[in-house]
Each structure stands twice: as C-alpha cells, then as structure tokens.
C-alpha cells in the first residue's frame, strides 16, 4: 500500500473515531465547556503550527496593513459562525448518536453547493443538472427516514430535537463556507483554521463564564480534562489538517469520496466503543443518503 492510500485509510478510520469521541465528550461535558476547551486547545496547536510552518503568511499579513482590518472582521465573523455551528452540532450529538452526526455531515456537502451557488457563479454552474436535485431529494428523504425511525425507537422526542440541532448546524456550516471561500483568497487555509478555532474558543469561554457553566469543570477529574484537551488536538489534526492535506495533494474528488465512507467507519467504531446500534431501516436510510449525495456531487467530481 503506497503512502497516499495509507493517508486515505487512516483519514477514514480516524474520522470514524472522531464522531464517537465528540459524542462521548458531549455526554460528559456541558456544551459550552466542551467547545471552549476543545477549540482553545486545538486552536493553540494550530497557532504553534502556523508560527513554525506558515511564518511567511503571517509576515505577508503584517506587511499589508490595509488588509489587517478586513481580515480581522471576516475572521471574527467566521469565528461567530463556527461558534454557532459547533454549539448546535455538539448538542445534536448529545441527543442523537455518533452515526447521526456523520450522516448529517454528508448532507452538508450538497447543501453547501446550493447556498454557494447563490453567490458564486462557478458554484452556480454545478447545480444546473437534474441529477443534483434528484440526489439532494434522495439525501433529504433518507435523512428523514433515519430520524423518524430513530425517534420512534427511542420512544421520546430527544432524537428529533437532536436532528433539528444537526440540521441547524449544517445550515450554518454552509453559510460559513462562503466566508471561508472569500477569506481563503487572501490567506492560507491553515491560518484561517488557527484564527477561527482560537476566536471560537474565546467566545465559548466567555459564554461559559457568563452562564457560570465554567465552574462545572471544578467537579471534573483531571483525567477527563486532559482527555477533552486531547480531543481538541485530535479534532484539529484529523478534521482540518488531514482534510487540507488530502484536498491539496489528492483533490476534492478523492476527498468527497472519502467523506462518504466515514459513516461506515463511524457505525463500526460507534458500535464497538459506545454500543450504538441501528436497525435495518436506519441502515437502509443511511445508504440512501450516501447514494443521494453521490448523485448530487457527480458533476462537481467531474469538474475537479
């Protein structure tokens, strides 16, 4: 197995483990504390990486005072969107499952294209095929079947509430991607990630102090806190750094295909680590979502 294939395999496996980790932390930590610790630790790691590997980018920004205010405004807005996105996403995971998070993550891809198509001509060209709409419809139907069957099995509305949180998160993420696309024309994506994660972590920390939730951390063992910090490192390295590497070295086509494999990896790891089980209808609906997204992304893949 060559190096590129090794990277692909490790990415799918590590991302498959990432959702159970987030689900586990969402159960044991209040959302504001969870996100503030994870984002501040992960953001700090990315800042260190930027200082070591991307000093030229930082010098370029400092050397152009005119764009500093421009970037600060957009990065701050991006941090706000990231804060909202992860608030709803973590709450969604708390009430659903790791697999549900990965399924809804797939739905974000075609939704992002639709929203981007409103503002960018190159994205608008991608939604002119009927296959896109057929695929999007299949994905939505599949996700609804998944949610309905899950909430019926639980016998309460918690799963349905979690699904609403996840839908809200992927909508915010789609709008957030528009800002990323605009800012990425000015600075490297890794620098964007470092800035966004740090700003989002600070915002979550302020909210945690304001709501007094931060004091709940006093009752948490040092082992769990270290685990949460490590989860922040893990999320940044797999969800951002490895993703950037694959997009840069292997292309968006390969990246999108790998994204479609993550729910399978998540289902297996979620079963082994969290004892999460799915019924036959949820399994079929998950496959429908994946097929729908493959159709919706088909033209995009050809163009990349």
UniProtKB/Swiss-Prot annotation:
Compartments in which it is found: Cell membrane
- Main localization category: membrane
Can you list the GO cellular component terms from the UniProt entry?
plasma membrane
According to Swiss-Prot or TrEMBL, what is its membrane topology?
Answer: Multi-pass membrane protein
| Family annotation (InterPro entries) | AA-Vitamin_Transporters, EamA_dom
Chain ranges passing through the membrane: 9-29, 67-87, 100-120, 131-151, 159-179, 189-209, 222-242, 252-272, 278-298
Keyword line: Cell membrane, Membrane, Repeat, Transmembrane, Transmembrane helix, Transport
SUPFAM superfamilies reported in the protein's UniProt record:
Multidrug resistance efflux transporter EmrE
Domain EamA: start-end pairs: 13-148, 171-298
Say which domain of life the source belongs to.
Bacteria
The family assignment reads: Belongs to the EamA transporter family.
Query: Which PANTHER family does the annotation name?
Result: INNER MEMBRANE TRANSPORTER (PTHR32322), S-ADENOSYLMETHIONINE_S-ADENOSYLHOMOCYSTEINE TRANSPORTER (PTHR32322:SF18)
The protein's name in its UniProt record: Uncharacterized transporter HI_0687
């Amino acid at each position: 197995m060559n190096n590129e294939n090794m990277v692909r395999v490790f990415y799918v496996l590590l991302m498959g483990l990432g959702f159970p980790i987030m689900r586990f932390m969402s159960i044991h930590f209040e959302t504001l504390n969870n996100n503030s610790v994870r984002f501040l630790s992960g953001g700090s790691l990315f800042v260190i990486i930027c200082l070591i590997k991307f000093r030229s980018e930082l010098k370029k920004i400092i050397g152009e005072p005119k764009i500093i205010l421009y970037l600060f405004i957009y990065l701050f807005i991006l941090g706000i969107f990231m804060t909202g996105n992860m608030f709803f996403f973590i709450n969604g995971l708390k009430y659903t499952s790791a697999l549900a998070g990965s399924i809804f993550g797939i739905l974000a891809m075609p939704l992002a294209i639709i929203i981007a198509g409103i503002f960018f001509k190159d994205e608008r060209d991608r939604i002119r095929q009927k296959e896109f709409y057929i695929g999007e419809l299949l994905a939505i139907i599949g996700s609804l079947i998944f949610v309905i069957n899950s909430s019926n099995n639980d016998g309460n509305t918690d799963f349905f509430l979690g699904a609403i949180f996840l839908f809200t998160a992927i909508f915010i993420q789609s709008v957030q991607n528009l800002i990323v696309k605009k800012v990425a024309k000015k600075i490297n994506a890794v620098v964007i990630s470092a800035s966004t994660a740090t700003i989002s972590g600070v915002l979550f920390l302020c909210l945690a102090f304001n709501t007094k939730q931060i004091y709940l951390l006093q009752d948490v063992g040092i082992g769990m806190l270290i685990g949460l910090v490590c989860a922040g490192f893990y999320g940044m390295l797999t969800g951002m750094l490895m993703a950037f590497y694959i997009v840069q070295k292997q292309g968006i086509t390969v990246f999108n295909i790998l994204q479609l494999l993550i729910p399978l990896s998540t289902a297996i790891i979620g079963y082994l680590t969290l004892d999460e089980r799915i019924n036959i209808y949820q399994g079929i609906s998950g496959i429908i979502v994946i097929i729908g997204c493959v159709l919706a992304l088909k033209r995009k893949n050809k163009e990349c």
